[in-house]
Amino acid sequence: MGLPWYRVHTVVLNDPGRLLSVHIMHTALVSGWAGSMALYELAVFDPSDPVLDPMWRQGMFVIPFMTRLGINNSWGGWSITGGTITNPGIWSYEGVAGAHIVFSGLCFLAAIWHWVYWDLEIFCDERTGKPSLDLPKIFGIHLFLSGVACFGFGAFHVTGLYGPGIWVSDPYGLTGKVQSVNPAWGAEGFDPFVPGGIASHHIAAGTLGILAGLFHLSVRPPQRLYKGLRMGNIETVLSSSIAAVFFAAFVVAGTMWYGSATTPIELFGPTRYQWDQGYFQQEIYRRVGAGLAENLSLSEAWSKIPEKLAFYDYIGNNPAKGGLFRAGSMDNGDGIAVGWLGHPIFRDKEGHELFVRRMPTFFETFPVVLVDGDGIVRADVPFRRAESKYSVEQVGVTVEFYGGELNGVSYSDPATVKKYARRAQLGEIFELDRATLKSDGVFRSSPRGWFTFGHATFALLFFFGHIWHGARTLFRDVFAGIDPDLDAQVEFGAFQKLGDPTTRRQVV
């Protein structure tokens, strides 16, 4: 045929059987990738420390999606929440991966069958004897079936009526587990952080899809609308399908990057805005304040802070800190977190408590500045020693740790104080193992960042694809060079000069 690479899909343009075949093969490839990727991730995943080395620190991409849909256990005898299990059941991580691979194989065989047996009676128009598809009817069928699936997911899987439920957590990502969810039918259902909205929206959207599908199966489109929207052209289907996909991709890029109930921080890592707003820092200080109000000592109050909460309050877990071309997991960057050293409190020789200014997201380096409770600069690590007024040595800064591994330990040596002041810029201080993975010390992004970047990029590409194919189908006659007045131009006697529309004969 000699088609250029960008025109190869024309071979299925008027061939319904093989059009179906290539779509089944595409499903086989997607499902096969998902199952294979899951098995690869399970082979390299270390479930031993769900607090300091969770899936998102290890760069897992498909395991979080399985987990949020209710998968908890592995045939390896471990659970994602920690501990061991004896009976994981068939729907473990490996079971789901295997089901995808088996499904992929069946789709592969079905694709081959439909490629070989392409000329089926079902695709033949009785009136013309040529292959054709009733596209409005097919649209109704697909809408009805997707509505059933959507309703079933919301009414059964998410609610736990027939299924495991979904991953639900608290606002600080500490108590997450798989549980059933009741639909939220009030205004709270529109809050993106309320899990009940997932159930109610799927039930509502599924019901709408079922009704819309039945409508399109029972009502034919008006002729003018059919022709105006080119409903008989398969490229119209392509264009509108691309529109649905790019719209969904833009939406999920947003829910992933800004956070929602569908993207829990325990599975995908925290968002950059939680660092920017001091979200976890405020909660930590609130808990410490509550402990002090109960007459606990400062050391006891800080020791009650969960290590998991302290770990979220570390800039290395900010997905916006990873560079665009820094491949690999977060653990390959700053290392595997081993333990929390504790919260450092700095004081000058006059007894003022000092706070280290934290590094903003988009800085790679940042001056070390210590301020008091009123925001007045009291100490710093100067760039030029000759002009310094507030150096650690001059001000006499000391540091004492509360909670964590260094609880009760204090340092007055200026070099050590400056070391911990630099590290306090990055949030809570953790001991990091860089040797095991040969980590290079340069921050990486989490799966939250990769997912957002990938979906936003492909959404933009697919947007242009929608415009391209929509224009092709709407203006097909123009691009093909077929003029609506062509018949008149070649009709004998229509013009005084053949083909010249300015010399049209007047009908008497």
From Swiss-Prot:
Q: Main site of residence?
A: plastid
What topology does the record note for this protein and the membrane?
A: Multi-pass membrane protein
Q: Name one GO molecular function term.
A: electron transporter, transferring electrons within the cyclic electron transport pathway of photosynthesis activity
Which domain of life, per UniProt?
A: Eukaryota
> Secreted: is it a keyword of this entry?
no
Under the cellular component aspect of Gene Ontology, which terms does the record hold?
Answer: chloroplast thylakoid membrane; photosystem II
Q: Which UniProt keywords apply?
A: Chlorophyll, Chloroplast, Chromophore, Membrane, Photosynthesis, Photosystem II, Plastid, Thylakoid, Transmembrane, Transmembrane helix
Choose any GO biological process term that the UniProt entry carries and state it: photosynthetic electron transport in photosystem II
Tell me where the transmembrane regions lie.
21-36, 101-115, 140-156, 203-218, 237-252, 457-472
Q: Where in the cell is the protein located?
A: Plastid, Chloroplast thylakoid membrane
Question: InterPro entries annotated for this entry?
Answer: PS_antenna-like, PS_II_antenna-like_sf, PSII_PsbB
Can you quote the record's cofactor note? Binds multiple chlorophylls. PSII binds additional chlorophylls, carotenoids and specific lipids.
What interactions and quaternary structure are annotated? PSII is composed of 1 copy each of membrane proteins PsbA, PsbB, PsbC, PsbD, PsbE, PsbF, PsbH, PsbI, PsbJ, PsbK, PsbL, PsbM, PsbT, PsbX, PsbY, PsbZ, Psb30/Ycf12, at least 3 peripheral proteins of the oxygen-evolving complex and a large number of cofactors. It forms dimeric complexes.
Entry's PANTHER family? PHOTOSYSTEM II CP43 REACTION CENTER PROTEIN (PTHR33180:SF37)
- Family membership: Belongs to the PsbB/PsbC family. PsbB subfamily.
**This protein is called what?**
Photosystem II CP47 reaction center protein
Provide the species name: Liriodendron tulipifera
